[in-house]
A protein has these predicted regions:
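Structured-RNA-binding interfaces characteristic of tRNA pseudouridine synthases
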Residues: 1-169
Length: 169
């Protein structure tokens, strides 16, 4: 409960990567269509901040879906893979995979910007939301405060956020 944040990395081999290297298949999601990182980064910006991520989570009884998303960025590596960096104070169940899945649906043209905006403005579970496969997801870093602040941070982490605390989209 003392962590102040976590960073996940998700790896995608899209159509621009000219096929999936067999050595990468165990930790990379193969998406046949080309993805435009600049367009995905622009769309991802609207998800940043303290908000209700119910549309992108599998809710757990008694838990909040309000989280502070600090970074959601798509970068093409030298090898042609796309690395998605996702940083938040905490994550709901399936949140990273749901966010990546939703943005890939948008990036491949299977969903439009209005659909993505609707997920943000009106949080709620949608059965058709694509969950990105788990094998391409890795926990990269956990952030902690100075040891003398562990107790304070643990209290903040245990406090359940309420709907009125989330920013409006």
């Amino acid at each position: 409960f003392s962590a102040t944040g976590r960073r996940y990395v998700y790896r995608i081999a899209d159509g621009a990567a000219n096929g999936l290297n067999p050595l990468h298949r165990t930790y990379t999601w193969a998406v046949p269509e080309h993805l435009d990182c600049a367009d995905l980064n622009q769309s991802a910006q609207q998800l940043l901040g303290l908000r209700d991520f119910l549309s992108f989570c599998k809710p757990r009884e008694g838990a909040t879906t309000i989280r502070e998303l600090r970074e959601l960025s798509f970068t093409r590596t030298e090898s042609g893979l796309i690395e998605v960096r996702v940083v938040a104070d905490a994550f709901c169940h399936h949140m990273v995979r749901s966010l990546v899945g939703a943005l890939v649906l948008y990036g491949t043209g299977k969903r439009d910007a209005a659909w993505l905006r609707e997920r943000i403005e009106n949080p709620g579970r949608e059965a058709s939301l694509t969950l990105a496969p788990p094998h391409a997801l890795a926990l990269a870093e956990i952030y902690y405060p100075a040891p003398e602040l562990y107790g304070e941070q643990a209290e903040r982490a245990r406090a359940k956020r309420e709907d009125h605390e989330a920013q409006s989209a």
